[in-house]
Curated annotation (Swiss-Prot):
Alphabetically ordered keywords of this record: ATP-binding, Cell membrane, Cytoplasm, Membrane, Nucleotide-binding, Protein transport, Translocase, Translocation, Transport
Protein name, as recorded: Protein translocase subunit SecA
PROSITE patterns registered for this protein in UniProt: SECA, SECA_MOTOR_DEAD
Coiled coil: none
Job description of the protein: Part of the Sec protein translocase complex. Interacts with the SecYEG preprotein conducting channel. Has a central role in coupling the hydrolysis of ATP to the transfer of proteins into and across the cell membrane, serving as an ATP-driven molecular motor driving the stepwise translocation of polypeptide chains across the membrane.
Basic residues composition-biased segments: 920-932
Entry-linked PANTHER family: CHLOROPLAST PROTEIN-TRANSPORTING ATPASE (PTHR30612:SF0), SECA INNER MEMBRANE COMPONENT OF SEC PROTEIN SECRETION SYSTEM (PTHR30612)
SMART domains attached to this UniProt entry: SecA_DEAD, SecA_PP_bind
GO terms assigned for molecular function: ATP binding; protein-exporting ATPase activity
Length: 932
């Protein structure tokens, strides 16, 4: 029964659909006139539309003409004319909605029109995909449309250098993955200079597979971390040995459903005996508990060849949803090290957080957000609640005629797979293409062996064979094809009956050495013929496969999420083609075993049928739906929890990152530094004068404290004399006199160094202190969050406590930033060198045609017209980055994975450090507050 909120959402959906139909009709009336334009005239439309928008005309008003232009542009470049429903989907995206469009409806092409329209503003459009392959493929293919229409397109890939990334972001339309966009945001906020910044704002984003990215992956935050101090690695090896002496149920408990472990009293005693300690839970031994829990999890919850594989002595994570190896990715919180110790391979060092953000809060940065997927309505309320995104179900271009058969349920997996193989064999004999979905690499390989025994030629698509995955998927609809895939979510390439003509044409041109960006003219000249030949080759076979019933999708197990089941089914029956789907299940499948074991046991107990006979039961369907509902509910709760806690940190992050960005972009900090000086002096005086009367205040301690900040030029006696005696001294008098003295001292410092030098010194010092203090604050917030759950035992709300203590810690950090900045500005010994001439090399890395349009025609000249003075002060040199950084992000299932990036270039303010020896001239070093 739909809730009231869901009914309201559906009402809004119907109103939006009416508006989209109006837009589609308006675009259709323009189609004939746009077809009469020459290529040059069509490109001129872009300049006209851009000028009209600059003159104040809204993008909504320009939509019909812009979409009509793109429809004609895509017809001429790709040979693809957008259907009315594709235009409706594009309009829904422009209006800031999620367009729910079934698999095969051409979502990649849909994105071109709203991207073009919003690209006219010159602020940049980001098209977000799930992996580098799709980003690159879509950028090359759809980028041809944008370039034909006079826009620029770019692509962000994980291996690119910062200079290349900056160029790609300067384009009108930029493709990339959610993780790369998020990590670039974090990197920008660790930057030491404006030259390191790559992103230029967050204007409009179109998120492909939006449910996967904004829902499934939103449980895990993006984290950039660097090597932590201390040698913890030896403990992983020790505890890997310890857990081999422990027995499940006797020494520890395991909950596979919640993926948690708990150590029992006998187990604790064994661990204490092995380590030679009296109490594992003493405060000094507390860190060891984490090593023990991770070692047990590695032993019981992480299975080789299912969750990870060992290749060349490395533990490589396997994506449980896509079945692909996630090269360079690592589990966080010590879990990867525990698995390495279990497998006796090299254990690599742990890290500490340098920057972090959740996907929810990253995507909330965009002025306008939209998305596409085939399966979004089940999460409509979460999209609205978290992102303020409505879901609009776009009609299919042709009616769906796929037949979804009822599930067949067997008592155990062995007989289930026997039935699966028999079904595949019968379909294969007829020539009908079969797509088989499995939930793990292990099961795909087991099924592959069974098919090989029968001599059935097939392709396996899993973590150990990802290099050819796009070509395998592209041919999965051909006559007689059998494809065994470990989860089809996020594969991207369309399965077309008879073969994928578009993919085949792209492959053919690549074989000829043609590239749409490197050799655009030759590519465009060859495309029409290559695409036509590919279409001819596939059309005849398409008709044969249609006669055979289309693509048969066979699922060997239900996934945890209903959406992923629907995505597998949705591979069949695209664009009105026939198709069929069926799931083969067993009562011992993981989903039933973990989440509805009681129902499974009751069914097995009741049934008197032989093992090899299938059950078709509504009770089974209800049990499966209940199990999937439990998983989805658990994951939704995790996402809510992650967001609640990150919202606390997000307000702090926005304040700090906003300050850093303004500093990097050249804001004058003189006024801010004066406020720092006032606040720091006032805080010191308030601390001294909080209790008692003037005669009893500790002036010696106050003057000692102020002496660490600046060369104080008056004494307590001077102040008393000014007001006629010590009895007349008040807190306000002290503030007035000391602040006046401090500002005179700063004015003298500026006169000595020069205004330009002091402005650059302010920028460098404040940036450095903010970077270091923010990094320390992240560590402390992590530490706070880890232990905050224990507050519930004292009948206190952990979230409220986290908010309260996090605010206190943030205020303490801001005070420390003010105090240390003032101390460094007064006390650092600075040598000023003559500024070098503007570097030609810098300009060489910034192609003028693209960047000048983004930054203004004279941007390059302004940037280099007046070079900043070169300051030589200990600790102010651009800091060294760690030799390697780790980037932790969600995989397709939402679990954390980490990739390592080794670096040799200079680094970021997040890593900056002013050594104690550099913090003084002839004065004591600035006082540092101790923060817990």
């Amino acid at each position: 029964m739909p809730s009231l909120f869901e009914k309201i959402l559906r009402t809004g959906d119907r109103k939006t659909l009416k508006r989209l139909h109006v837009y589609a009709d308006a675009i259709n009336t323009l189609e004939d006139s746009f077809q009469t334009f020459t290529d040059a005239e069509l490109r001129e439309e872009t300049d006209k539309l851009r000028a009209r928008h600059a003159d104040g005309e809204s993008l909504d008003d320009l939509l019909p003409e812009a979409f009509a232009a793109v429809r004609e542009g895509s017809r001429r470049t790709l040979g693809m004319r957008q259907f009315d429903v594709q235009l409706m989907g594009g309009a829904a995206l422009h209006l800031g909605n999620i367009a729910e469009m079934k698999t095969g409806e051409g979502k990649t092409l849909v994105a071109t029109a709203p991207a073009y329209l919003n690209g006219l503003s010159g602020k940049g459009v980001h098209i977000v995909t799930t992996n580098d392959y799709l980003a690159s493929y879509q950028s090359e293919l759809m980028g041809r449309v944008h370039r034909f229409m006079g826009l620029t397109s770019g692509c962000i890939l994980s291996a690119q250098e910062p200079s290349e990334r900056r160029l790609q972001y300067a384009a009108d339309v930029t493709y990339g993955t959610n993780n790369e966009f998020g990590f670039d945001y974090l990197r920008d906020n660790m930057a030491w200079s404006s030259e390191e910044l790559v992103q230029r704002g967050h204007h409009f984003a179109i998120v492909d597979e939006v449910d996967s990215i904004l829902i499934d992956e939103a449980r895990t935050p993006l984290i950039i971390s660097g090597p932590a101090s201390g040698d913890a690695n030896r403990w992983y090896g020790e505890f890997a040995k310890v857990v081999l002496r422990l027995d499940v149920d006797d020494d520890y408990e395991v909950d596979e459903k919640k993926r948690t472990v708990g150590v029992l009293e006998p187990g604790i005693e064994k661990v204490e005996d092995y380590l030679g300690i009296s109490n594992l839970y003493e405060s000094a031994n507390t860190p060891l508990i984490g090593f023990l829990n991770n070692a047990i999890k590695a032993k019981e919850l992480f299975k080789r060849d299912k969750d990870y594989v060992i290749l060349d002595g490395e533990v490589l994570i396997v994506d449980e949803h896509t079945g692909r190896i996630l090269a360079g990715r690592r589990y966080n919180e010590g879990m990867h090290q525990a698995i390495e110790a279990k497998e006796s391979v090299e254990i690599k060092a742990e890290n500490q957080t340098l920057a972090t953000v959740t996907l929810q809060n990253y995507f909330r940065l965009y002025e306008k957000l939209s998305g596409m997927t085939g399966t979004a309505e089940t999460e409509a309320s979460e999209f609205m609640g978290t992102y303020e995104l409505g879901v609009v179900a776009i009609p299919t271009n042709k009616p769906m005629v796929r037949i979804d058969q009822s599930d067949l349920v067997y008592k155990n997996e062995v007989v289930k797979f026997e039935a699966v193989v028999k079904d595949i064999e019968e379909r294969h004999k007829e020539g009908q293409p079969v797509l088989v979905g499995t939930t793990s690499v292990e099961k795909s390989e087991y099924l592959s062996k069974q098919l090989s025994k029968l001599g059935i030629k097939h392709e396996v698509l899993n973590a150990k064979n990802h290099a050819r995955e796009a070509s395998i998927v592209a041919q999965a609809g051909r006559k007689g094809a059998v494809t065994v895939a470990t989860n089809m979510a996020g594969r991207g390439t369309d399965i077309m009956l008879g073969g994928n003509a578009e993919f085949n044409a792209v492959t053919e041109l690549a074989k000829r050495g043609l590239d749409p960006e490197e050799t655009p003219e030759e590519y465009e000249a060859a495309w029409a013929e290559a695409y036509e030949k590919a279409q001819e080759a596939t059309e005849e076979e398409h008709e044969e496969v249609v006669e055979l019933g289309g693509l048969y999708v066979l699922g060997t197990e239900r996934h945890e999420s209903r959406r992923i089941d629907n995505q597998l089914r949705g591979r069949s029956g695209r664009q009105g083609d026939p198709g069929e789907s069926r799931f083969y299940l067993s009562l011992t499948d993981d989903l039933m075993r973990l989440f509805n074991s009681g129902a499974a046991e009751r069914l097995m107990g009741r049934s008197v049928m032989p093992d090899d006979q299938a059950l078709e039961s509504k009770l089974v369907s209800k049990a499966i739906a209940s199990a999937q509902g439990q998983v989805e509910g658990r994951n939704a709760e995790q996402r809510k929890n992650v967001l609640k806690y990150d919202d606390v940190l997000n307000r702090q992050r926005e304040a700090i990152y906003g300050d850093r960005r303004r500093i990097l972009e050249g804001d004058d900090l003189h006024e801010k530094v004066q406020h720092f000086l006032e606040d720091t002096v006032n805080e010191s005086i308030d601390a001294t004068t909080a209790e008692g009367h003037a005669e009893g205040w500790d002036y010696k301690a106050l003057w000692s404290s102020l002496g660490t900040l600046y060369p104080i030029g008056l004494t307590a006696d001077d102040v008393a004399e000014e007001v006629g005696g010590l009895a007349n001294v008040t807190s306000d008098v002290l503030k007035r006199e000391i602040l006046s003295d401090a500002k005179l001292a700063y004015q003298g410092r500026e006169e000595k160094l020069g205004s330009e030098t002091i402005r650059e010194l302010e920028r460098r010092v404040v940036l450095s202190v903010i970077g270091r203090k923010w990094q320390e604050h992240l560590y402390e917030m992590d530490y706070l969050k880890e232990g905050i759950g224990l507050r519930a035992m004292a009948q206190r709300d952990p979230l409220v406590e986290y908010q309260r203590e996090g605010f206190v810690m943030f205020q303490a950090m801001m005070g420390a930033i003010r105090e240390e900045s003032v101390g460094f500005l007064f006390n650092l010994e600075v040598q000023v060198e003559e500024a070098p001439a503007a570097s030609a090399g810098v300009q060489a890395n910034q192609p003028s045609a693209l960047l000048d349009r983004v930054n203004g025609e004279d941007a390059g000249a302004e940037a280099h017209a007046s070079a900043k003075p070169v300051l030589n002060a200990p600790g102010l040199a651009e800091p060294e980055r760690p030799s390697q950084l780790q980037f932790t992000a969600p995989d397709a299932s939402g679990e954390a994975e980490t990739r390592i990036e080794r670096r040799s270039t200079a680094g970021s303010a997040g890593d900056s450090n002013l050594p104690p020896s550099a913090r003084k001239t002839n004065k004591p070093a600035p006082k540092r507050k101790k923060r817990r």
